[in-house]
C-alpha cells in the first residue's frame, strides 16, 4: 500500500507487519523531503513513526481520541490522516499547520504548541466520555521532556486517583526535549529506559507458574496474587513512581518495534483504569545527521538532504537578537559572578547556550518549568544574585501569577528577556509573541522596555541589571538591523526616557521596539507626499516618557502609535491612557495587531496581512487623517517593507 493512498488511519487495520514497516519508510521519506525543502520540526516526528502506526493499528479513529503533546511529534499523524497531498505546504500561509489544529482536521482532537497539556486534555475527554455514557478510548502521547512540566505531573496525580477511568498515557521517551532534559525525573526515566519491560516480567512469571505440574494450566487466585508481588518486586527498578501514583505501568519497550508495540497497546486497552506505556524511541530515527545531532535537528530551516547542511541565505544577515543577547550576557557574567542566566529548556532558542558553554556555573536550565523558573529567580534575587530569565514571550504567559505574586509585588531585581516578542511566523498562533506588552504593563513595580536595534539591546540589558527592581526587555525573532556593536562599556539608559529620531510638524509617530525602523521608513514615505513627521523611539513602555510625548502631541495635534503586539492593552493603549489622565485630547491612531489570531505564514506575510508594512501604514495614516492619497503612487509602488 502506498502512503499517498492512505486517507484514513483505520486503513492501517489488517495490514501485515511488513506492510506497516513499508508505510513507516514512506512516512520518513515524505517527512524528510518536505522539511528539507520548507523547514519545520524534523527530529521529533522521525522518532515516532512506528509508535504512531502501532498505536493507530489498535484504535478506531472514527471514535477513539488521541491527543499529541506540543505537536512537534505529530507530522506522521498528519501524513496518515488525510494530509499527504497538501503536506508540501507545511507551515506556509494557507497550508498545513506545523502544530495540531482542531479546525484543520477532525483527527486533531486538541490544538497545542506549548508543552505538557496532553494528559490534562485527554483526561478531560475521558471524563466527558464517561459522563455521557460512551465507550471510546482516550489517549495522550507525551514526550519525556514535556513530562517534566508541572502541568503534566498535576494531571498524572489526578488521573491516578481515578482507578475506574480507562485512560492511556503513552510516554515517548527519546531522552530529549528540544535540548537534553534536566532534573531528577529525567534521570529516573533514563534508568528506566535500560530496564527489562515490567509487563513481560509479570507475564513470564505467570507462564512459568502455569507450567508447574500441580497447577495444570489454571492459576488459583492466591497464586495470582503471588505473581503480582513478583511484579511489584521488579517495579522499584522501573515504574515505581507511576505505579505508586495509581497507573498500571508497562514498559519500557522498543519504540521502533511495531509488532511489540501493537501487543503492548492491545494489553493496555484491556486494563480498566489509567495505564502508562513507556516507549523508548530515538529522536531523528532514520536520518543519520538528525540522530547524531538531536538538538540541531529538532527543527530545521531548509537543508540539503545529502549533506544535512542548511541551505545558506542568498545574502548575509546580521546576527540575530538572540545571539547578540547571549554574547552580551556572557561578557557581563565574566565581569559579575552574581549574574545568573536561567532558561526553561530553551537554551539554544534564547541564546543562553553561549553562556552554558562559556560559564556553565552561571547558567541554570530548569526544564519545561516556566513557573518554577520565575520563582527560582525571585529566590535568587532575595539573597543578592542578579538572575536573567531568558524565555519566549509566548511561554512567559504560563508564569503570569509568579510575575505578579513572586516578583512584582516584592519588587525583586529579576531581569526577563522575552525572546520571539511580536510576530514569529510559521509557528502560528500558539507561538506569536503578541500579548506580552499587554500583560506586562499592568504588573506592579516592573520596568518594561524594547530596543530599536541590537546596539540598544546591549544598553538595555545593562540598564536592567543596574536597576533595583524587576525589568522586562522584549526582543523580536530574527536578525538585527546590522548596526555596529560594542564589545563592552555599554552605557545604561535613563529609565523612562525616549528619543526623537526625526523632526516634523504634521504628524507625531510614536514607535516601540521592533517597529521603530518601520516607523522611520513610514515617515520617509509620508515625506515624499509632503507630510513631515516627528518620529519618537519610545524605548520604555513602563514608565512612559510623558515629559517628551505630551508636549509634542499638544504641538503637532495628530498622533500615530506603532507596535508589534496586540492593540488591546498595548503600547498605543498606554499612550491614549496617559493622554486621558492629563485631559489631553489629541486624535490618536493606533497601529498594531488587532483582536485576532495571527495564523502561520512568513513574518513578512503576517505583517502584510495586518497592514504593518511601511507602505500600508503610510496609506492607512493618510486615509485616517484625511490627507489626499490619489497622487501618492509611491504608497502602492514602494518596495520598502519592515524587516
Curated annotation (Swiss-Prot):
<feature type="binding site">
    <location>
        <position position="370"/>
    </location>
    <ligand>
        <name>thiamine diphosphate</name>
    </ligand>
</feature>
<dbReference type="InterPro" id="IPR049557">
    <property type="entry name" value="Transketolase_CS"/>
</dbReference>
<comment type="similarity">
    <text>Belongs to the transketolase family. DXPS subfamily.</text>
</comment>
<dbReference type="GO" id="GO:0005829">
    <property type="term" value="C:cytosol"/>
</dbReference>
<feature type="binding site">
    <location>
        <position position="72"/>
    </location>
    <ligand>
        <name>thiamine diphosphate</name>
    </ligand>
</feature>
<dbReference type="InterPro" id="IPR029061">
    <property type="entry name" value="THDP-binding"/>
</dbReference>
<dbReference type="GO" id="GO:0008661">
    <property type="term" value="F:1-deoxy-D-xylulose-5-phosphate synthase activity"/>
</dbReference>
<dbReference type="InterPro" id="IPR020826">
    <property type="entry name" value="Transketolase_BS"/>
</dbReference>
<comment type="function">
    <text>Catalyzes the acyloin condensation reaction between C atoms 2 and 3 of pyruvate and glyceraldehyde 3-phosphate to yield 1-deoxy-D-xylulose-5-phosphate (DXP).</text>
</comment>
<dbReference type="InterPro" id="IPR005475">
    <property type="entry name" value="Transketolase-like_Pyr-bd"/>
</dbReference>
<dbReference type="GO" id="GO:0052865">
    <property type="term" value="P:1-deoxy-D-xylulose 5-phosphate biosynthetic process"/>
</dbReference>
<dbReference type="GO" id="GO:0030976">
    <property type="term" value="F:thiamine pyrophosphate binding"/>
</dbReference>
<keyword id="KW-0786">Thiamine pyrophosphate</keyword>
<dbReference type="Pfam" id="PF13292">
    <property type="entry name" value="DXP_synthase_N"/>
</dbReference>
<comment type="subunit">
    <text>Homodimer.</text>
</comment>
<dbReference type="Pfam" id="PF02780">
    <property type="entry name" value="Transketolase_C"/>
</dbReference>
<feature type="binding site">
    <location>
        <begin position="113"/>
        <end position="115"/>
    </location>
    <ligand>
        <name>thiamine diphosphate</name>
    </ligand>
</feature>
<keyword id="KW-0784">Thiamine biosynthesis</keyword>
<comment type="pathway">
    <text>Metabolic intermediate biosynthesis; 1-deoxy-D-xylulose 5-phosphate biosynthesis; 1-deoxy-D-xylulose 5-phosphate from D-glyceraldehyde 3-phosphate and pyruvate: step 1/1.</text>
</comment>
<dbReference type="InterPro" id="IPR009014">
    <property type="entry name" value="Transketo_C/PFOR_II"/>
</dbReference>
<dbReference type="GO" id="GO:0009228">
    <property type="term" value="P:thiamine biosynthetic process"/>
</dbReference>
<dbReference type="GO" id="GO:0016114">
    <property type="term" value="P:terpenoid biosynthetic process"/>
</dbReference>
<dbReference type="GO" id="GO:0019288">
    <property type="term" value="P:isopentenyl diphosphate biosynthetic process, methylerythritol 4-phosphate pathway"/>
</dbReference>
<feature type="binding site">
    <location>
        <position position="287"/>
    </location>
    <ligand>
        <name>thiamine diphosphate</name>
    </ligand>
</feature>
<keyword id="KW-0808">Transferase</keyword>
<feature type="binding site">
    <location>
        <position position="174"/>
    </location>
    <ligand>
        <name>Mg(2+)</name>
    </ligand>
</feature>
<protein>
    <recommendedName>
        <fullName>1-deoxy-D-xylulose-5-phosphate synthase</fullName>
        <ecNumber>2.2.1.7</ecNumber>
    </recommendedName>
</protein>
<dbReference type="InterPro" id="IPR033248">
    <property type="entry name" value="Transketolase_C"/>
</dbReference>
<dbReference type="InterPro" id="IPR005477">
    <property type="entry name" value="Dxylulose-5-P_synthase"/>
</dbReference>
<keyword id="KW-0460">Magnesium</keyword>
<feature type="binding site">
    <location>
        <position position="144"/>
    </location>
    <ligand>
        <name>Mg(2+)</name>
    </ligand>
</feature>
<dbReference type="GO" id="GO:0000287">
    <property type="term" value="F:magnesium ion binding"/>
</dbReference>
<keyword id="KW-0414">Isoprene biosynthesis</keyword>
<feature type="binding site">
    <location>
        <position position="174"/>
    </location>
    <ligand>
        <name>thiamine diphosphate</name>
    </ligand>
</feature>
<keyword id="KW-0479">Metal-binding</keyword>
<dbReference type="Pfam" id="PF02779">
    <property type="entry name" value="Transket_pyr"/>
</dbReference>
<feature type="binding site">
    <location>
        <begin position="145"/>
        <end position="146"/>
    </location>
    <ligand>
        <name>thiamine diphosphate</name>
    </ligand>
</feature>
Amino acid at each position: 500500500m502506498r502512503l499517498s493512498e492512505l486517507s484514513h488511519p483505520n486503513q492501517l487495520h489488517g495490514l501485515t507487519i511488513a506492510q506497516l514497516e513499508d508505510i513507516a519508510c514512506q512516512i520518513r521519506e515524505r517527512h524528510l523531503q518536505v522539511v528539507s525543502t520548507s523547514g519545520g520540526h524534523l527530529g521529533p516526528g522521525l522518532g515516532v513513526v512506528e509508535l504512531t502506526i502501532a498505536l493507530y493499528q489498535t484504535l478506531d479513529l472514527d471514535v477513539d481520541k488521541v491527543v499529541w503533546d506540543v505537536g512537534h511529534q505529530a507530522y506522521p499523524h498528519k501524513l496518515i490522516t488525510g494530509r499527504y497531498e497538501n503536506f508540501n505546504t507545511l507551515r506556509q500561509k494557507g497550508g498545513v499547520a506545523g502544530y495540531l489544529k482542531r479546525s484543520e482536521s477532525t483527527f486533531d482532537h486538541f490544538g497545542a504548541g506549548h508543552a505538557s497539556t496532553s494528559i490534562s486534555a485527554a483526561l478531560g475527554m475521558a471524563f466527558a466520555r464517561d459522563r455521557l455514557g460512551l465507550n471510546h478510548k482516550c489517549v495522550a502521547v507525551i514526550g519525556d521532556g514535556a513530562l517534566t512540566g508541572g502541568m503534566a505531573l498535576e494531571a498524572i496525580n489526578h488521573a491516578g486517583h481515578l482507578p475506574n477511568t480507562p485512560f492511556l498515557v503513552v510516554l515517548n521517551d527519546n531522552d530529549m526535549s528540544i535540548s537534553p532534559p534536566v532534573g531528577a525525573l529525567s534521570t529516573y526515566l533514563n534508568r528506566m529506559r535500560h530496564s527489562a519491560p515490567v509487563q513481560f516480567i509479570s507475564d513470564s512469571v505467570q507462564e512459568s507458574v502455569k507450567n508447574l505440574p500441580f497447577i495444570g494450566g489454571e492459576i488459583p487466585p492466591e497464586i495470582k496474587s503471588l505473581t503480582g508481588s513478583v511484579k511489584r518486586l521488579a517495579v522499584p527498578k522501573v515504574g515505581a513512581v507511576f505505579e505508586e501514583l495509581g497507573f498500571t505501568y508497562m514498559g519500557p519497550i522498543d519504540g521502533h518495534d511495531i509488532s511489540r508495540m501493537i501487543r503492548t497497546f492491545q494489553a493496555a486497552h484491556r486494563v480498566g483504569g489509567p495505564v502508562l506505556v513507556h516507549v523508548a524511541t530515538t529522536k531523528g530515527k532514520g536520518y543519520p545527521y538528525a540522530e547524531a545531532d538531536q538538538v540541531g535537528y529538532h527543527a530545521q530551516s531548509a537543508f540539503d538532504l545529502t549533506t544535512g547542511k542548511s541551505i545558506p541565505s542568498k545574502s548575509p544577515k546580521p546576527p540575530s537578537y538572540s545571539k547578540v543577547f547571549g554574547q552580551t550576557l556572557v561578557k557581563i557574567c565574566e565581569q559579575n559572578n552574581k549574574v545568573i542566566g536561567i532558561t526553561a529548556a530553551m537554551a539554544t532558542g534564547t541564546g543562553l547556550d553561549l553562556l552554558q558553554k562559556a560559564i556553565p556555573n552561571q547558567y541554570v536550565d530548569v526544564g519545561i518549568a516556566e513557573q518554577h523558573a520565575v520563582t527560582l529567580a525571585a529566590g535568587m534575587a532575595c539573597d543578592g544574585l542578579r538572575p536573567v530569565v531568558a524565555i519566549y514571550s509566548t511561554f512567559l504567559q504560563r508564569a503570569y501569577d509568579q510575575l505578579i505574586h513572586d516578583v512584582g509585588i516584592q519588587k525583586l531585581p529579576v531581569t526577563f528577556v522575552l525572546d520571539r516578542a511580536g510576530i514569529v511566523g510559521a509557528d502560528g498562533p500558539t507561538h506569536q509573541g503578541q500579548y506580552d506588552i499587554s500583560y506586562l504593563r499592568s504588573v506592579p513595580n516592573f520596568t518594561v522596555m524594547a530596543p530599536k536595534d541590537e546596539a540598544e539591546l546591549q544598553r538595555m540589558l545593562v540598564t536592567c541589571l543596574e536597576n533595583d527592581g524587576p525589568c522586562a526587555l522584549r526582543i523580536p525573532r530574527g536578525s538585527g538591523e546590522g548596526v555596529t556593536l560594542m564589545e563592552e562599556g555599554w552605557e545604561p539608559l535613563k529609565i523612562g526616557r525616549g528619543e526623537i529620531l526625526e523632526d516634523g510638524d504634521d504628524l507625531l509617530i510614536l514607535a516601540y521596539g521592533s517597529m521603530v525602523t518601520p516607523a522611520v521608513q513610514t515617515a520617509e514615505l509620508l515625506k515624499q507626499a509632503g507630510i513631515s513627521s516627528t518620529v519618537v523611539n519610545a524605548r520604555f513602555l513602563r514608565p512612559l516618557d510623558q515629559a517628551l510625548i505630551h508636549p509634542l502631541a499638544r504641538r503637532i495635534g495628530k498622533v500615530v502609535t506603532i507596535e508589534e503586539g496586540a492593540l488591546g492593552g498595548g503600547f498605543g493603549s498606554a499612550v491614549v491612557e496617559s493622554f486621558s489622565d492629563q485631559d489631553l485630547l489629541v486624535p490618536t491612531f493606533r497601529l498594531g495587531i488587532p483582536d485576532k489570531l495571527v495564523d502561520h505564514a512568513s513574518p513578512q506575510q503576517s505583517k502584510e496581512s495586518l497592514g504593518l508594512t511601511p507602505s500600508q501604514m503610510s496609506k492607512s495614516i493618510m486615509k485616517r487623517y484625511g490627507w489626499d492619497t490619489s497622487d501618492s503612487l509611491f504608497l502602492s509602488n514602494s518596495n520598502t517593507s519592515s524587516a
